[in-house]
UniProtKB/Swiss-Prot annotation:
UniProt region (Disordered), positions on chain: 99-127, 358-393
Family recorded in the similarity comment: Belongs to the XPG/RAD2 endonuclease family. FEN1 subfamily.
Residues holding Mg(2+) 2: D183, D185, D237
This protein's name: Flap endonuclease 1
EC nos: 3.1.-.-
Gene name of the encoded protein: FEN1
Superkingdom field: Eukaryota
Amino acid sequence: MGVLGLSKLLYDRTPGAIKEQELKVYFGRRIAIDASMAVYQFVIAMKGFQEGQSVELTNEAGDVTSHLSGIFFRTLRMIDEGLRPIYVFDGKPPTLKASELESRRQRAEDAKHEFEKAKEEGDDEAMEKMSKRMVRVGRDQMEEVKTLLRLMGIPVVQAPSEAEAQCAELVKKNKAWAVGTEDMDALAFGSRVMLRHLTYGEAKKRPIAEYHLDEILEASGFSMQQFIDLCILLGCDYVPRISGIGPHKAWEGIKKYGSLEAFIESLDGTRYVVPEEFNYKDARNFFLEPEVTPGEEIDIQFREPDEEGLIKFLVDEKLFSKERVLKGIQRLRDALTKKTQGRLDQFFTITKPQKQVNSEASTAGTKRNRGAVALPGVLQRKSSSGHKKAVKK
């Protein structure tokens, strides 16, 4: 879920803090990408529906390969444009997220029932809609994505807990310039810059939305803690919402009362019921001090692609087209060996006018530096896989 309604609220209230960009603008930038979010996007995007059947991208053996094909081609596209993606994977979800995870499980069950109902009624449109809501990416598929990225030479980071928090930590410690995710809570975790739509395919033709935390805070007048309180009040993954509190009421409430405590105290108890499980202090502390691997302990390295390993994994095991894989490897090598100019802002200090892309944000919070494992990075591109085949659900 991220933070419910935050994106639209920021467009309404702090439009100057959001910029629409093309992919090529991020030439030379290291971007920490929420891997789970990206993989789900690829799987859903490649899921089709034909003649009453769910259709997924598969190889000749019938194995689903959309997660690998999606990561392979989108990563190649980013590398072609000069980006340097760093993929960050979720670890163990925090206890605070248990209720949200149960809600997601229930929504998936509801979608399954709606799918069967639509099937009986012959409603293909509803069946396609519900089939996308039923998409789940298993642990084995995620491990395959990690294997592919390492063989490509792309850095892989395993977060101890939430990937967005680990991505934000990499930005805070200058290991990455921005976080790439659809979940707005990357801002609540303190990322100076956040990019949405980064992993969208060309077919969607949507510009990348670039959010700047320091400009959001400046335009809103919020402190970092007040911004976190706003995110909690809007609805996040760690506490239930207070029914009846919309985005603009939440904004005005934090502006007027200065804190979540004072705002809650002001509420009319006969009109608004604060859920018993509304442990907002725990949620606030988690945003301020998430469980992450300290950024300075993570070594980000982009490496040469392992051609032999890629052929073995993608062609021999996953039955991808060898020709397409080899072309992908060559694209990657071309991008890596190409002599390119560095970004000007890496060599000169640029005086900030009113709005500056590289502005520094005050970021709150320390980390609980617990048992995280940083996986060695690798870099490279891959080619796609097989053909579309019907997979009955």
